[in-house]
């Protein structure tokens, strides 16, 4: 019992001590007021690649974060509360990576700083909205239970401002979610060239922005002070805000034992909406609701994205005819152009449609009277004509002499007697009918009046002599001739053919019935009385022009001013004159080399063609380019394609030229548009596809993009290939190990265009030079261009320079009149060095000879093993040829030959062409083989001392027998023409004009030797032979 009383005080003391320990521990826990701070660090392309070496600006951001972590120190408030820190961090680009979750400070300070220091930048796009929402998630799942003590520090440059859809709902949505949760967001800039509007959106309000800066380019004291001030200001703001939360009461003693349960309190205020829960399963469909009231008209929505191309609309109606435009001012008369070249003879055309008959021609001259034609075949007898009315009785004429007894007519059959008819009245005279079929012989009628003689018809064109026809029947009796003198009564002739039927006379009275046979016809009666004059005939044809009369005396002046008479009718065409004598032989027409020279002067610039080509555009689509600059770059590509199509006539179609575009960002972020794609049918489809390219806004892996271009868009081809690489020259070479010279090769030319980015940085020339293959051993060197801004891409001058560079290897026709030798050839140029030439003119011929020699020695050969050799010799009098025979040789080295020509001195003596030809003939027989073509080009005016045409003919024929073909150059008008013809043809008797045109060259003066393309003409004809 005593033991129990002794132990009881000890037990009570132990219980009291335990109670004090528990209360003490609770008091300590209550004194901590935790604050959660989470860093959101931007390591996108616009930050990582802004400074060299790449990642330097990210290192500054990491340095800022570590300095900030070092400043997170606990603080004791007067309310007996301690501020303690929980800190964490993430970094982001187009993906988000947690550096370290919320960690208790200061115990986890070193681990957090080490994790920040080990960050490797992403260097791609910028998804700030996703990063903020990930930071909110980290703050909510750990740390303090007080939402008022949770803070987010977003360190970014704010890029990009626009141009692509942020995948996590957008920046404003993320910031509004933070405000809704009561989490404050500080916005800290990476300066300069940050986007203040975006940073202002990120900050909870303007007090959380305050021009805070986390990194600056400069290393000055001011920059360090600004960063230190940023850290101190943010920490002080958090401490002040937290004090109001942690010290919401003055003092609080240790807690006592729990009291009795209190009464239920009043209903509290409505709490803040909770976080959105997970998406539930779809419920059963509800029944249709009642029709609601008509809603108010909503506000105008934001502008939608560009719609797809609509279907082709219906064909429009034909428009009204436009008004006639105002006539333009007449232009000035242009300069006289070069004469056009004769075109090739066209193929015969199809027979045209027969044209309408032409107008009646002028009457031809009267032809000579043709010979009497042979008798034609008997015509069919015409139908009997109507009887004309008898004319008025004429005056009795003088009795004519008795006519010759007519031939007895055929005996006719006796006709039946007709009944006497009544006498009819005289009818109108009808037109003469065609002769009818001969009828039976009628009763003898009364003699009709004699008709007027008709007018003579025009003489017809004599016809071709026809074949002899069959003997025709006996013709009718001819017209009655004029009465001749009375002749002797002749014996009765044979019975003649019946005469033409006369006009039907009036019916006579019935006679007594006959009773005998019909007698022979009586003699013709006397001519009747002369009838009245006939109607006037039509106007006859004009007669032949008479001989020119003598000039008459001048008439008296007529002072009356009469009106001018009507212009007379066009006269008849005179007879064709005799053929004139043949004209002189005209000068030779332009040679082929002269024609090519004319063509080159007229249209060589417009005939050079650009293409076919393969042009590739490699377009930087990284974040540092910016949306507006990316759109300008696409317009530049379209304008280049248009200029090549219109100005350079490049045809972008299958089998011709090809174009392609590659846009790129970071690794595996490439997209291309290719004219070889099945959905791109023409250049218009290609341009539409380029317009639809969307800005990627990521990192910059230029080497990988160039490798992609070579693998996908550079198949083997014979076309000229050129690649235009448009970039800011800041490829992430630390992570992109593909060399920038991947396109360098002998089959492609690379042009790099470097442009300042959105931060105003000048493009890196070192990368641009490597891209364009400059200073490299492999590949053809390209061109590197640097521009201040993307707007300069659309400058007209720059576009013109780019298209000129693309088409620098134009395919132009060859107007140089090239020459080719089909066999080995030895050519000697024989220069006249006599006194008649003169020293100045001799120097001119030496220059001309060197031009010819250069053309000969550089000419093409059908077989490279066949040699062309040239020798130049000057001559004057007898025995005066230089170089001498010992030094003379054929040369193939132009430099040596030109030096020997330059060393020639003017001889200035007599002229002996025969001796010069004999010298060259001996030289060829000794130094030239038999299979080699031997040609001599001789300068001469045909004058030779003491030489005759026969002597020259002998010398030329001797050279021809040695196989030498002679060409002659004649300078000036003072020439011996007969001797020149003998030098050309080797004949004194005749001259072949065609042969002379090929072997004779006439020049007006020595200066003309060096003008134009005469040296090409001469060398070509000598080469062809």
From Swiss-Prot:
Residues 578-588 have a biased composition (Pro residues). Residues 267-284, 300-333 have a biased composition (Basic and acidic residues). SMART domains: VWA. Disulfide bonds: none annotated. Residues 20-255 are annotated as: N-terminal globular domain. Glycans are attached at residues 211, 515, 536, 801, 893. One of its GO terms (biological process) is uterus development. Collagen VI acts as a cell-binding protein. This is Collagen alpha-1(VI) chain. It comes from Mus musculus.
């Amino acid at each position: 019992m005593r033991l129990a009383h002794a132990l009881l005080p000890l037990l009570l003391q132990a219980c009291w001590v335990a109670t004090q320990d528990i209360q003490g521990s609770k008091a300590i826990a209550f004194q901590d007021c935790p604050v959660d701070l989470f860093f959101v660090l931007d390591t996108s392309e616009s930050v990582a690649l802004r400074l060299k070496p790449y990642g330097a600006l990210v290192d500054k951001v990491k340095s800022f974060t570590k300095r900030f972590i070092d400043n997170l120190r606990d603080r004791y408030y007067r309310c007996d509360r301690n501020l303690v820190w929980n800190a964490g961090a993430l970094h982001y680009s187009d993906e988000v990576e947690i550096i370290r979750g919320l960690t208790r400070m200061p115990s986890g300070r070193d681990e957090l700083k080490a994790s920040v220091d080990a960050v490797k930048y992403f260097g791609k796009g910028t998804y700030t909205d996703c990063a903020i929402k990930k930071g909110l998630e980290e703050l909510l799942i750990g740390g303090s239970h007080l939402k008022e003590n949770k803070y987010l520090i977003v360190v970014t440059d704010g890029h990009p401002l626009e141009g692509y859809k942020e995948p996590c709902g957008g920046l404003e949505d993320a910031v509004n979610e933070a405000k809704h949760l009561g989490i404050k967001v500080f916005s800290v800039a990476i300066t300069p060239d940050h986007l203040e509007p975006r940073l202002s959106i990120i900050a909870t309000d303007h007090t959380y922005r305050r021009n805070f800066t986390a990194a600056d380019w400069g290393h000055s004291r001011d920059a360090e002070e600004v960063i230190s001030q940023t850290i101190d200001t943010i920490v002080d703001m958090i401490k002040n805000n937290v004090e109001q939360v942690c010290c919401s009461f003055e003092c609080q003693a240790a807690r006592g034992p729990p009291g009795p349960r209190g009464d239920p309190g009043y209903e509290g205020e409505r709490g803040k909406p909770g976080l959105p829960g997970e998406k539930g399963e779809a419920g059963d469909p509800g029944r249709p609701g009642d029709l609601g009231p008509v809603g108010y008209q909503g506000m105008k929505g934001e502008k939608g994205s560009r719609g797809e191309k609509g279907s082709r609309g219906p064909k429009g109606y034909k428009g009204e005819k436009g008004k006639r435009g105002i006539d333009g001012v007449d232009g000035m008369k242009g300069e006289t152009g070069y004469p056009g070249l004769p075109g090739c003879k066209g193929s015969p055309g199809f027979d045209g449609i027969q044209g309408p008959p032409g107008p009646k021609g002028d009457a031809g001259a009267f032809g000579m009277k043709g010979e009497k034609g042979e008798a034609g075949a008997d015509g069919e007898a015409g139908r009997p004509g109507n009887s004309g009315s008898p004319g008025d009785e004429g005056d009795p004429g003088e009795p004519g002499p008795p006519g010759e007894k007519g031939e007895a007519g055929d005996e006719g059959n006796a006709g039946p007697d007709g009944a006497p008819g009544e006498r009819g009245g005289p009818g109108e005279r009808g037109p003469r009918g065609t002769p009818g079929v001969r009828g039976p012989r009628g009763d003898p009628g009364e003699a009709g009046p004699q008709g007027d003689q008709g007018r003579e018809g025009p003489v017809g064109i004599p016809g071709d002599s026809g074949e002899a026809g069959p003997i025709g029947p006996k013709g009718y009796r001819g017209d009655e001739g004029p009465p001749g003198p009375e002749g002797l009564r002749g014996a009765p002739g044979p019975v003649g053919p019946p005469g033409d039927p006369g006009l039907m006379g009036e019916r006579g009275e019935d006679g007594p019935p006959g009773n005998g046979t019909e007698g022979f016809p009586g003699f013709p009666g006397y001519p009747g009385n002369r009838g009245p004059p006939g109607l006037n005939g039509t106007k006859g044809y004009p007669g032949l022009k008479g001989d020119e009369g003598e000039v008459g005396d001048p008439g008296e002046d007529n002072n009356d001013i009469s009106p001018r008479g009507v212009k007379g009718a066009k006269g008849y065409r005179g007879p064709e004159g005799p053929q004139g004598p043949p004209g002189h032989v005209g000068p030779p027409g332009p040679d082929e080399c002269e024609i090519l020279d004319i063509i080159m002067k007229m249209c060589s610039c417009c005939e050079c063609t650009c293409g076919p080509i393969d042009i590739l555009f490699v377009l930087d689509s990284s974040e540092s380019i910016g949306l507006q600059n990316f759109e300008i770059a696409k317009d530049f590509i379209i304008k280049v394609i248009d200029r090549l199509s219109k100005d350079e006539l490049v045809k972008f179609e299958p089998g011709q030229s090809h174009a392609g575009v590659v846009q790129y960002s970071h690794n595996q972020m490439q997209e291309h548009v290719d004219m070889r794609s099945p959905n791109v049918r023409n250049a218009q489809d290609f341009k539409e596809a380029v317009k639809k390219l969307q800005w990627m806004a990521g990192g910059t892996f230029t080497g990988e993009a160039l490798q992609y271009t070579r693998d996908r868009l550079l198949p083997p081809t014979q076309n000229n290939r050129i690649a235009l690489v448009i970039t800011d020259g800041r490829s992430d070479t630390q992570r992109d190990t593909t060399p920038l010279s991947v396109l360098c090769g002998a089959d492609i030319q690379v042009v790099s265009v470097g442009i300042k980015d959105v931060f105003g940085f000048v493009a890196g020339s070192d990368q641009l030079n490597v891209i364009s293959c400059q200073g490299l051993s492999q590949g053809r060197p390209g061109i590197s261009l640097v521009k201040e801004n993307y707007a300069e891409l659309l400058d007209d001058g720059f576009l013109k320079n780019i298209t000129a560079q693309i088409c620098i290897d134009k395919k132009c026709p060859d107007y140089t009149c090239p020459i080719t030798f089909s066999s080995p050839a030895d050519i000697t140029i024989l220069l006249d060095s006599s006194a008649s030439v003169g020293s100045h003119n001799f120097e001119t011929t030496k220059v001309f000879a060197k031009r010819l020699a250069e053309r000969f020695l550089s000419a093409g050969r059908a077989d490279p093993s066949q040699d062309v050799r040239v020798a130049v010799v000057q001559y004057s009098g007898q025995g005066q040829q230089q170089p001498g025979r010992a030094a003379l040789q054929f040369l193939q080295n132009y430099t040596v030959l030109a030096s020997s020509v330059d060393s020639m001195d003017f001889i200035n003596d007599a002229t002996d062409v025969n001796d010069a030809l004999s010298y060259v003939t001996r030289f060829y027989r000794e130094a030239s083989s038999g299979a080699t073509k031997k040609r001599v080009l001789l300068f001469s005016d045909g004058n030779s001392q003491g030489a005759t045409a026969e002597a020259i003919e002998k010398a030329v024929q001797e050279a021809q027998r040695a196989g030498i073909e002679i060409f002659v150059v004649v300078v000036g008008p003072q020439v011996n023409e007969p001797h020149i013809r003998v030098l050309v043809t080797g004949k004194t008797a005749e001259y072949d004009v065609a042969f002379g045109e090929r072997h004779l060259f006439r020049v007006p003066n020595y200066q003309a030797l060096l003008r134009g393309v005469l040296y090409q003409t001469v060398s070509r004809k000598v080469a062809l032979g």
